Amino acid sequence: MTIIDTRTPDPKRLIPGATGDWEVIIGMEIHAQVTSRAKLFSGASTEFGAEPNANVSLVDAAMPGMLPVINEECVKQAIRTGLGLKAQINHRSVFDRKNYFYPDLPQGYQISQYKQPIVGEGIVIVSVGPAKDGSFEEIQVGIERLHLEQDAGKSLHDQHPTMSYVDLNRSGVALMEIVSKPDMRSADEAKAFLTKLRSILRYLGTCDGNMDEGSMRADVNVSVRRPGEPFGTRCEIKNVNSIRFVGQAIESEARRQIAILEDGGAIDQETRLFDPGKGETRSMRSKEEAHDYRYFPDPDLVPLVFDQAYVDALAAELPELPDEKKARFMASFGLSEYDASVLVAERATAAYFEKVAAGRDGKAAANWVINDLLGALNRTGKDIEDTPVSPDHLGTIIDLIKDGTISGKIAKDLFEIVWNEGGDPVRIVEERGLKQVTDTGAIEKAVDEVIAANPDKVEQAKAKPTLAGWFVGQVMKATGGKANPQAVNALVNQKLGIE
């Protein structure tokens, strides 16, 4: 395959070395476990966390005479993913045997797709950033192909002092291998690409993207070169299982290769592993070429053939994807690109926001969801599906601010009460006396008391009007945050003689 370099070297992406600047070239192969209740060629369950060898059929164990039968749901999921990646869907694809030996690969080969994959070239638009001014830079990362293949089993080395055991629960589970083109030029771009791809898969419902459970893993190909020169020799970093580790692995491997080249050495094409504890990669084995696997069509499986009507029916059922939803949020709710990007990153977050924003000010809803709700979720380690503050409750809090029932400060306290204790926001406001003080007489009394207690500050404020804000803060503090801020501000300015 001829690799075409489509990007001009970007000075801000270059890595400074002892002998000049270097450019890192990154491509990825992502193994995404297909969301399906059964495996690719058997009816065994794909449940995560089952007892070892509980979900194994005779096909998965490669018992003599057992033949594979394709799971149509896995085919549909691959097509849906291809459509989500704006990729070419191949109406005819072929399953091949990829021959190699692993102790946890009972067949002695993996059923995969080589020359004729189910999905061809596609594209992912990736937003990198934000920059200091809040802007994003968009890059295009090409998708070379997507093919279906079986996962291998798992070797267990910690069960016995002298023996290793094999768990075949994962054997035969359907994977989509999504191969990107080498279009990324920094660790940040690679992390943004992987984040975007995972978001697309989750929106489509074709992979849960849970990297900590192994249902999405990345093989990262890294090489370095002088700007404008041909691609260098690449090394593959296998099975990186978090987006943060992907970034660390790329940075470590790029530094390693630059150091070797600057010392006059040469890069060996090899497969490496990333050690998160040490923050570095280490050699695993020499990198195989395609001919090492002796691919040939699987004689037990006929070619996979479907027509355009089959594809069109699946396309008609696709959900709104992140890019389309982001554009709609910006247009319909007047959100900034940053806020819209945060809200659409996860499908559940976007759905929550839409419920809160329905019939309300979109910007206010976005601020509460991003700053307060997501902040609380991050602080407590909860998922949005488990939030104690429902969209209806958050919407009610926003309504109470808008109609003047509570102040913005009290609203923050009310959110924490609902988060920690639950309950209806309206009832909590009534029972705890949290309503905003709008009585001008009561507010004026509080203003007079603060001014009387701080005569030195009064003279300073008259000379420097911005200090009026200090008086406003003291009045709000004295009233427990219940005073109407606009009324307080107006009275403070009036009493201090500030226009």
UniProtKB/Swiss-Prot annotation:
Keyword set, alphabetical order: ATP-binding, Ligase, Nucleotide-binding, Protein biosynthesis
GO molecular function, one term: asparaginyl-tRNA synthase (glutamine-hydrolyzing) activity
An individual GO BP term: glutaminyl-tRNAGln biosynthesis via transamidation
Key word Protein biosynthesis present: yes
Reactions catalysed according to its record: L-glutamyl-tRNA(Gln) + L-glutamine + ATP + H2O = L-glutaminyl-tRNA(Gln) + L-glutamate + ADP + phosphate + H(+); L-aspartyl-tRNA(Asn) + L-glutamine + ATP + H2O = L-asparaginyl-tRNA(Asn) + L-glutamate + ADP + phosphate + 2 H(+)
Enzyme Commission number(s) of this protein: 6.3.5.-
Matching SUPFAM superfamilies: GatB/YqeY motif (SSF89095), Glutamine synthetase/guanido kinase (SSF55931)
Domain of life: Bacteria
Keyword Nucleotide-binding: yes
HAMAP family, per the entry: GatB
Family per record: Belongs to the GatB/GatE family. GatB subfamily.
Primary role: Allows the formation of correctly charged Asn-tRNA(Asn) or Gln-tRNA(Gln) through the transamidation of misacylated Asp-tRNA(Asn) or Glu-tRNA(Gln) in organisms which lack either or both of asparaginyl-tRNA or glutaminyl-tRNA synthetases. The reaction takes place in the presence of glutamine and ATP through an activated phospho-Asp-tRNA(Asn) or phospho-Glu-tRNA(Gln).
Subunit description: Heterotrimer of A, B and C subunits.
Protein's name according to its UniProt entry: Aspartyl/glutamyl-tRNA(Asn/Gln) amidotransferase subunit B
Source organism (scientific name): Chelativorans sp. (strain BNC1)
